[in-house]
């Protein structure tokens, strides 16, 4: 057996080397029939020699279209001439609009040029002639099941993106293979493909600028970064794709933040979140009954830790079946009493729903079967997998009736009058995840052999009273045709492909591309196949949990890189890791540190697995203290956070920023992924090593202020050591030049928090100036009837408040304290000419504190002199 394995390995290695050699011998394409109207260039591409057919059949005739869509965005698409090859549907990904301008090609920030035989192209910056994309060193390969395109890179590139992954923020650039194929990935291991796919990278070149490259393609792919063979050894980035077309969007930047905004113009802006969504969330897989959930809520209250939203995992379901309730452990009367209790106290409730529907005797399945909305096998029968409830069916999201079916199930089960009156929903397992190994020919056997669904815990009487809770919670009381037989439209995929075992094998950690997911030869209701659309299943949302992480220091650390990837690169800003870790048993020290760090994720939730120890923050005294401290800081900053998040929903300007986004010319920031900016003002620098009570942090050449004291610190572009950092503390610094609006105090819920007046922290830059903003709305409505967008400017001793003041509230719309950090002398204060001596100055800290009354209902001005 061992000898046979070695023989197979040798054959495989020889095959790979042979394939690689054959790829370099492919003829590429030659150009003809070029048409250029100044805005759009079109050309025909024809195979330039004998087909190489390495991983499929070469497509002999292609076409090229180049559009100068905006001043900063260039669109380049290479597709088959007949448009039979699959392309991402417009219904899933609406294409960005193009600005019509006949002279765009001569004025755009980016310039396209090409060589006609063999075809290659370059994209350069018009202002500097710097080449940012160059395919001339390797032939274009466009086959039925394989596409390859290689571009040159600088010698020491700074690349970011190409996720989802748990690797460093700045990608390694030697022998890197990043695979894009959505996978349910317990433990989120580094170096593997994870839950989502984002085929975009940012190339940051310091003073030369930053550009972005987005490939609109949902097929599985390997993106390789390395050095060419030989003495030259030039760096390259290479796409190896299982199908689709080459549909590129180039974004000129030139700053990292501008690239982020330009990318948002292509993929769409994220949705705004409710104000309460930024509070603390608590969940666990393994709450045994409704009383257990209620007791957690009670314990948080008793510990004095503000809990905004309670969650329940799949435990509430009857046999893990979606849209059902375990009537013995989570009876409807107890669930409704729990939700009513939370709502009466301005708290919220969320449950999980998986996309897979239990196959068999349940109403949700029967309705879906009647409406014909489930994925089908080749024989027309409902495709079966195995997930938590056992044998399952999967909604076909391309079926025209699926959305109505799904909406109706929600309407029935979450009926506010009769069902569970939830405030939001958690969708999980939507990679799509399937426990059953490929080929999953006997899902019923898998269910039986793996004891699905898991046995629920024994039913128990309510064990003890919970003071203040309702009586209910107290003791004692594959053919490429549509299903209708019509022919497929164009751009739906070529016939004759091997949809299960393609000739080119991407480095999917799960092995076969059909393993642990839906079979890739399944045909959707609109005729598209799962092979092409797998990476689209369940990806049209903009709120993201980073998956089943582990309670380990390494995962605590790389969660920072992950949140930065999603918020700053992929335009998915409502993101967070499971605080204290999902899998394994967290230590007290790690949980305390994570409670502090998690307060600076946009999405802040403690969640863990049924097999791990309970890890609610109140389980340890030190973690309780850390959580209280962290939430107190977060809540005082919540309007600053809310404003930064709103800004990203309007412009794409990230709510979280790597240091190089703020200091793009400082080379020492390019690789930093253990510090980050929340918004533009707040530098977060957590302790990241076990047992450490100090942390070495980098401060760029700028003025900073200690968050806790206001003490100025001159950054010199060097590392400094923060000493005596206990597990209940996290180093925070304001950046000079920023004005930060804060609530005067924290609160137990975000509803109460909104009743607090404001304070302004004016952090002077080296010239004595600062600016900031504040966004206000009602915090909940999908369509906001009245909003305020307020600008603060401090210049030459004058604070100006201007902007739009449409949001009106009976209370809390005033600034009662102003703190000026970096002020160098005592002063008097004039407010519209009236002297106000109610101020204090700390000469050592250079901190001025002023009591004020500035209404946020209209413009105002205050002079400090």
UniProtKB/Swiss-Prot annotation:
It is found in: Secreted. One of its GO terms (cellular component) is extracellular region. It is an enzyme of class 3 (hydrolase). Its main location: secreted. Gene3D superfamilies: Glycosidases, glycosyl hydrolase (family 31), Golgi alpha-mannosidase II. Its EC number is 3.2.1.20, 3.2.1.21. It comes from the Eukaryota. It catalyses: Hydrolysis of terminal, non-reducing (1->4)-linked alpha-D-glucose residues with release of alpha-D-glucose; Hydrolysis of terminal, non-reducing beta-D-glucosyl residues with release of beta-D-glucose. This is Probable alpha/beta-glucosidase ARB_02101. It comes from Arthroderma benhamiae (strain ATCC MYA-4681 / CBS 112371) (Trichophyton mentagrophytes).
């Amino acid at each position: 057996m061992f000898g046979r394995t070695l023989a197979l390995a040798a054959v495989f290695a020889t095959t790979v080397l042979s394939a690689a050699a054959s790829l370099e011998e492919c003829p590429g394409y030659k150009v003809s029939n070029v048409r250029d109207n100044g805005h759009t260039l079109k050309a025909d591409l024809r195979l330039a020699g004998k087909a190489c057919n390495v991983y499929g059949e070469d497509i002999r005739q292609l076409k090229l279209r180049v559009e100068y869509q905006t001043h900063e965005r260039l669109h380049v698409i290479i597709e088959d001439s007949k448009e039979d090859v699959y392309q991402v549907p417009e219904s899933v990904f609406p294409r960005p609009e193009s600005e019509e301008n006949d002279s765009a090609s001569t004025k755009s920030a980016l310039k396209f040029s090409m060589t006609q035989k063999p075809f290659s192209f370059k994209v350069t910056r018009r202002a500097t002639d710097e080449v940012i994309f160059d395919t001339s060193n390797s032939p274009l390969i466009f086959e039925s099941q394989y596409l390859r395109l290689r571009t040159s890179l600088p010698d020491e590139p700074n690349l970011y993106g190409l996720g989802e992954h748990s690797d460093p923020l700045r990608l390694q650039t030697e022998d890197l293979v990043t695979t894009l194929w959505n996978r349910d990935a317990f433990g989120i291991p580094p170096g593997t493909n994870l839950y989502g796919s984002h085929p975009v990278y940012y190339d940051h070149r310091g003073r030369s600028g930053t550009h972005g490259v987005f490939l609109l393609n949902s097929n599985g792919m390997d993106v390789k970064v390395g050095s060419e063979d030989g003495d030259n050894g030039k760096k390259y980035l290479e796409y190896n794709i299982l199908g689709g077309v080459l549909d590129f969007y180039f974004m000129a930047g030139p700053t990292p933040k501008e690239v982020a905004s330009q990318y948002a113009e292509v993929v769409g802006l994220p949705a705004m979140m409710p104000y309460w969504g930024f509070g603390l969330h608590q969940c666990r897989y393994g709450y045994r009954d409704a009383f257990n959930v209620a007791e957690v809520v009670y314990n948080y209250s008793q510990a004095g830790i503000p809990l905004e939203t309670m969650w329940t995992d799949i435990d509430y379901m009857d046999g893990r079946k979606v849209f059902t309730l375990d009537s013995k452990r989570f009876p409807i009367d107890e669930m409704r009493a729990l939700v009513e209790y939370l709502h009466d106290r301005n708290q919220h409730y969320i449950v999980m729903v998986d996309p897979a529907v239990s196959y068999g005797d349940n109403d949700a399945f029967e309705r879906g079967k009647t409406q014909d909305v489930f994925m089908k096998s080749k024989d027309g029968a409902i495709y079966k997998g195995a997930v938590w409830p056992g044998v399952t069916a999967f909604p076909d999201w391309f079926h025209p009736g699926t959305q109505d079916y799904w909406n109706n199930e929600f309407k029935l089960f979450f009926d506010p009058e009769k069902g569970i009156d939830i405030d939001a929903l958690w969708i999980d397992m939507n990679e799509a995840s399937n426990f059953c190994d490929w080929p999953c020919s006997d899902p019923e056997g898998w269910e039986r052999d793996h004891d699905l669904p898991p046995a629920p815990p024994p039913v128990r009487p309510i064990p003890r009273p919970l003071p203040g809770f309702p009586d209910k919670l107290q003791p004692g009381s594959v053919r490429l045709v549509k299903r209708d037989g019509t022919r497929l439209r164009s751009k739906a995929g070529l016939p004759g492909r091997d949809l299960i075992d393609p000739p080119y094998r991407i480095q999917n950690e799960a092995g076969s591309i059909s393993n642990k997911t839906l079979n890739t030869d399944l045909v959707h209701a609109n005729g598209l196949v799962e092979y092409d659309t797998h990476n689209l299943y369940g990806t049209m949302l903009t709120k993201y949990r980073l998956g089943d992480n582990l309670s380990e220091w390494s995962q605590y650390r790389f969660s920072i890189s992950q949140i930065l990837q999603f918020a700053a690169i992929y335009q998915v800003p409502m993101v967070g890791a499971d605080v204290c870790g999902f899998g394994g048993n967290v230590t007290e020290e790690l949980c305390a540190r994570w409670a502090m760090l998690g307060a600076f994720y946009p999405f802040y939730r403690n969640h863990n697995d049924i097999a791990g120890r309970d890890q609610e923050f109140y389980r340890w005294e030190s973690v309780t203290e850390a959580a209280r401290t962290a939430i107190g800081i977060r809540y005082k900053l919540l309007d600053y956070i809310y404003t930064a998040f709103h800004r990203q929903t309007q412009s794409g300007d990230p709510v979280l920023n790597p240091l190089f986004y703020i200091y793009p010319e400082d080379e020492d920031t390019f690789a930093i992924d253990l510090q980050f900016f929340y918004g533009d003002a707040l530098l977060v620098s957590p302790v990241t090593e076990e047992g450490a009570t100090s942390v070495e942090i980098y401060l760029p050449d700028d003025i900073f202020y200690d968050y806790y004291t206001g003490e100025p610190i001159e950054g010199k572009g060097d590392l400094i050591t923060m000493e005596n950092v206990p597990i209940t503390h996290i180093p925070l610094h304001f950046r000079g030049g920023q004005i930060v609006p804060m609530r005067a105090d924290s609160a137990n819920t975000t509803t109460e928090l909104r009743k607090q007046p404001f304070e302004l922290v004016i952090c002077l830059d080296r010239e004595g100036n600062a600016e900031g903003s504040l966004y206000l709305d009602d915090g909940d409505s999908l369509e906001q009837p009245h909003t305020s967008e307020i600008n603060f400017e401090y210049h030459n001793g004058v604070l100006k408040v201007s902007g739009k003041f449409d949001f009106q509230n009976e209370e809390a719309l005033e600034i009662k304290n102003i703190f000026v950090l970096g002020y160098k002398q005592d002063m008097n204060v004039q407010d519209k000419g009236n002297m106000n001596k109610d101020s204090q100055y700390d000469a050592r800290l250079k901190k001025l504190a002023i009591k004020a009354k500035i209404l946020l209902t209209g413009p105002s001005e205050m002079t400090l002199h």
